[in-house]
Amino acid sequence: MERRVEVGELLPGEGALSVAADIYLPLRMRSPPTALFCLPGGALTRGYYDLQPDPAPEPARSAADFSFARSLAARGFIVVTLDPLGVGGSSRPRDGFELTPDVLTKANAAAVDSICSDLRAGGVAGGGPPLEELRTIGVGHSMGAMLTAMHQARECRHAGLMLFGYSTRGLAPALSPEEAAFSDDPAGTRQNVVRLARARSREPYPEINSSQGRGLFAGKGADRRGVEALQSARAELLITAGLFSMIPGSSAPECVRLDIPIFLAVGDQDIAGPPHEIPASFPAAPDVTLLVLPATGHCHFLFASRRHLFARASDWLETVVT
């Protein structure tokens, strides 16, 4: 079920902006009803959460093979996938350099609040039952995990977070000397990130070429069918937010404040740094679960370990929301 959610006038001269979403409703709703709000990583659309090989697999139930959304919906959870502003079906401002993480977070928060209100009132599925006891979980991959953490630190909406392929380490080797000078200086990064993004790229929505993308997103051991399905979920990069996520420590203050259970999943061939160092970034969280996926790169859903990930995610959710 596709939705477009108005999120208001967030940038001068752009008018009202909207966020695109897909809502996957379970055939049998678990109790209490729980919605997962999922944000994709950089250079990906919300389609990352519902990868479908071409031609369509048979039998129909195997359509969930690479699909986080369908797998978790089959386990009784509502899954909502969102395109950040500038990506996929969401509004694309003319000056994409102004899409800072703070602007994106405001838009995401507005979209989540709107959809939650509809779910609680029973207005999503054409007269479905009101879900007054709805619980929510924030889910994000890579840059989307950063935005999910920032949303929770700002709004405190969710009962827990699931963060995939994410740490506060950034990608220091990919930075220029001027960009690297802001490492572990989140205030300075915020003040300068738009200027740095304009210096780094002439385009606010640059494309990642196919060979570079395959190396970053897939890598050794990725299932060919998943790699091919991922092509339909590829998008241009949001350069400002992408650069922000690459600068070490940029989102550390938000992570320090998170005081809810957190599920971390990283591949042993991921780009998030040493996995067992990541939980230390969440000192206020009462429970931090770390799952290290074997023989797995950055886009976890492309690898054989995805089935274990989907099952562990479901088990963790049961402990958090019951």
Residue ranges and their predicted role:
Residues 98-130:
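Alpha/beta-hydrolase active-site loop
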Residues 176-269:
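Alpha/beta-hydrolase
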Residues 266-296:
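Conserved loop-alpha-helix segment in the C-terminal half of the alpha/beta-hydrolase fold
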Residues 29-80:
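Short, surface-exposed "cap/lid" segments of acyl-processing enzymes
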Residues 296-307:
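Catalytic histidine-centered segment of alpha/beta-hydrolase-like enzymes
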Residues 47, 70, 84-99, 298-299:
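Glycine-rich "HGGG/HGxG" loop immediately N-terminal to the catalytic nucleophile
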Residues 132-171:
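Conserved hydrolase catalytic core segment
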Residues 1-31:
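N-terminal cap/lid segment of alpha/beta-hydrolase-fold proteins
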